[in-house]
């Protein structure tokens, strides 16, 4: 294995917190493979680059010679992770968990090394748990400690309901670490309480406590909100190569270094060089996005696919060409009492926007074109004739043909 300091340089790159860092150093000094834990409740069958951030870090651990345990929350998903929530999360059924987990693991293995990955389901030890064991675990935690969590504290002080079963979630996640004897547990920066609970429980059970390592939440392509399907700012791991490349090209310049560090396969030295280029003003954002797009497409679709996607992008957008596969829609163009059509509703119907709110934001930002002509900002209503057999476009990747 590499010297401890060289391993730490890789491990700490892009992380938010490592608690405690000295403890991680001591574990690495043993010069034996560590067991790196990531627990996931597969609430959705499809992953995006935001989900891939901790998986990429786990792959770095694997490349350093360590092992990974991926815990599928077949037990905890029946409760629903309350982290970062202002209301009770609807629990998943066992059938939903199983179906989503299969797709999740298949996509995760595009990133992880299967030879160094163990996949387990925490339902295997949670579901058979008897009352005596459950009460013993719950006695290790106090309500006062649980209410230290920001999300629970906010809900409590705002008099929003907190179901009793939600208190159990961090207890069971902590118990997962005991069962698999985790050396390091990873999660998003909204998971720090749960990760530290695992440390405490392991210590109470006379085990060497795990290290808590958190990763930042990836900002979406809009450069403001976290990446999420609900915000329409995501890059899916199963997106077609051309779509994936086009979405990378649409990210805002200021988040390019973050995307390189959290989503690419570049070395630490290469990442540091990109950071310096932004600091000293020598960066070429356009070329950096092209290289990033190639790298990400190659990672998820195979070597050489990035260049093909770049060529398709150049042919389409440099020459202002309309894609060959624009989806066609037949919709009703019913005017209101003023003889006008509310455009945001149409944009949702043709799948250019996921909601009226997103459609209005696209219009406000000047991001909509009709027949390849920019729509003036704040233009929410248009005459029916404007939309007859119109070609609608949002940015560089969303198109719709009305017929």
Model-identified regions with their sequence ranges:
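Short, active-site-adjacent cap segments at secondary-structure transitions
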Residues: 77-79, 126-128, 219
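Short, hydrophobic/aliphatic alpha-helical segments
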Residues: 31-39, 61, 68, 169-179, ...
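Conserved beta-strand termini and adjacent loop/short-helix elements that scaffold enzyme active sites
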Residues: 71-73, 120-122, 215, 331
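Conserved nucleotide- and phosphate/pyrophosphate-binding catalytic cores
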Residues: 202-403
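Beta-lactamase-like hydrolase cores
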Residues: 1-28
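Divalent-metal (Mg2+/Mn2+/Ca2+)-assisted nucleotide/phosphate chemistry catalytic cores
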Residues: 15, 91-94, 98-214, 223
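N-terminal catalytic cores of NTP/NDP-binding nucleotidyl/phosphoryl-transfer enzymes
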Residues: 18-82, 184-192, 198
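Well-ordered mid-protein domain cores that form the structural environment of catalytic cofactors
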Residues: 59-112
